[in-house]
Amino acid sequence: MAQKIIKVRDIEIANDKPFVLFGGINVLESRDLAMQACEEYVRVTEKLGIPYVFKASFDKANRSSITSFRGPGLEEGMKIFEEVKKTFGVPVITDVHEPHQAAAVAEVCDIIQLPAFLSRQTDLVVAMAKTGAVINIKKAQFLAPQEMKHILTKCEEAGNDQLILCERGSSFGYNNLVVDMLGFGIMKQFEYPVFFDVTHALQMPGGRADSAGGRRAQVTDLAKAGMSQGLAGLFLEAHPDPENAKCDGPCALRLNKLEPFLSQLKQLDDLVKSFPPIETA
């Protein structure tokens, strides 16, 4: 099965190529934190030879509580992203929540992300697609893998085939998510690159009453399980002080564990992609 290659600058993203990291922090808590985190990601990924894209949100529009921290907003967020790009020379990905934001975000960011909760919102999907930017489509927690085909079609009909799919877990009762490993293979049949958002798959939505809980201790186990499926990339959030992170701290990898964590995943990805395919249909 031929796999589509999506290009972001000089990075080639495909299910049969070495994995790409979309990594960063959950939300732009501050300019200084963004710079600190990106510097460490760049150091580690350059050392390990992993293609890298910095990620963060300028607005967390779907927080549990009205009092939850949301971020600096569109204008200030784009300024921070521009500084990150200029300082470190890396591409940037961020999420778009409303149709009117799409064009402005696409002017600055190399990849724009369709949030899982909003992935069926046709007006948003079409507005993002019409920018012509590469789009990372998060699979909603309530959608089956095969239903992602409809979202791909919406983008294609709007004239955009620069698309990436991203698994982030499925609802499993209340306050819990699970990852169906068979879903990766189903989505790979669409031939677009497939990523695994291990950070948000560790969430326990609403698990702390007014915010999400998480299972950071299991990040390595879940990441290895997902990346053993031969994927285009990994989506990861890390933080220097997860206990005091302003969003999703319980799911975030400790930033000082980034190098050993990614080193093991790089070795696993290289091994899995060295195997010849076996036809079992």
Curated annotation (Swiss-Prot):
Claim: Cytoplasm is one of the keywords in the record: yes
TM ranges: none
GO biological process: keto-3-deoxy-D-manno-octulosonic acid biosynthetic process
Reaction equations catalysed: D-arabinose 5-phosphate + phosphoenolpyruvate + H2O = 3-deoxy-alpha-D-manno-2-octulosonate-8-phosphate + phosphate
Keywords, sorted A to Z: Cytoplasm, Lipopolysaccharide biosynthesis, Transferase
GO molecular-function terms, A-Z: 3-deoxy-8-phosphooctulonate synthase activity
Pathway(s) served: Carbohydrate biosynthesis; 3-deoxy-D-manno-octulosonate biosynthesis; 3-deoxy-D-manno-octulosonate from D-ribulose 5-phosphate: step 2/3; Bacterial outer membrane biogenesis; lipopolysaccharide biosynthesis
InterPro entries found in the cross-reference section: Aldolase_TIM, DAHP1/KDSA, KDO8P_synthase
UniProt GO cellular component terms: cytoplasm
Main location: cytoplasm
Signal peptide: none
SUPFAM superfamilies assigned: Aldolase
Enzyme nomenclature, EC number: 2.5.1.55
UniProt name for this protein: 2-dehydro-3-deoxyphosphooctonate aldolase
The organism of origin for this protein: Ectopseudomonas mendocina (strain ymp) (Pseudomonas mendocina)
Native organism taxonomy: Bacteria, Pseudomonadati, Pseudomonadota, Gammaproteobacteria, Pseudomonadales
Gene: kdsA
